[in-house]
């Protein structure tokens, strides 16, 4: 396969105080970059300003108080329990592609064939929130077709899975 392309992609690095955005050029199936920074980043985001057309809907919120926070376009609502020592930045990404498969066999648990979420950001010490992630197994024309192929039988055994990042196995929360 000959891939001839040159796609600029922004990477934003943050230490919770300062953000630095750099543009890299993706020009092959695999690339490696060395990016010198004048800070120690605690968080990074790829294509934060959504300039690349992909299968992700993302939204960020700066949390400044305990409240119910609707994260628009992501089908997630946060119920902030504790603000922590200062405001936190929360980024929700709703990926409209299947998640990576289990690394090890996990009988009886099936991953969505359609979507998953990732949650990251700059979380200050003491920050605590609960999240409501919308599951919709209906075929309603307005809000449905999100999970209609996921569970075709009883929906009484739905579990929420988590992994700290790629290369880790999914685990039940």
Spans of features found by a protein language model:
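Self-processing/autoproteolytic domain segments and adjacent N-terminal interaction modules in large
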Residues: 64-172
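Non-catalytic accessory/interaction domains
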Residues: 1-90, 98
């Amino acid at each position: 396969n000959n891939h001839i392309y040159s796609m600029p992609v922004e990477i934003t690095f943050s230490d919770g105080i300062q953000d630095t955005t750099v543009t890299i050029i993706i020009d092959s199936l695999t690339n490696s970059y060395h990016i010198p920074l004048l800070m120690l980043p605690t968080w990074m985001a790829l294509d934060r300003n959504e300039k690349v057309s992909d299968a992700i809907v993302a939204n960020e919120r700066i949390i400044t108080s305990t409240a119910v926070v609707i994260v628009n376009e992501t089908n997630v609502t946060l119920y902030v329990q504790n603000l922590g020592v200062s405001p936190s930045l929360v980024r929700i990404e709703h990926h409209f592609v299947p998640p990576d498969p289990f690394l090890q066999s996990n009988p009886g648990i099936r991953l969505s064939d359609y979507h998953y979420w990732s949650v990251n950001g700059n979380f200050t010490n003491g920050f605590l929130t609960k999240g409501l992630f919308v599951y919709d197994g209906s075929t309603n024309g307005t809000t449905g077709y999100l999970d209609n192929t996921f569970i075709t039988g009883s929906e009484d055994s739905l579990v929420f899975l988590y992994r700290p990042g790629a290369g880790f196995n999914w685990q039940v929360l």
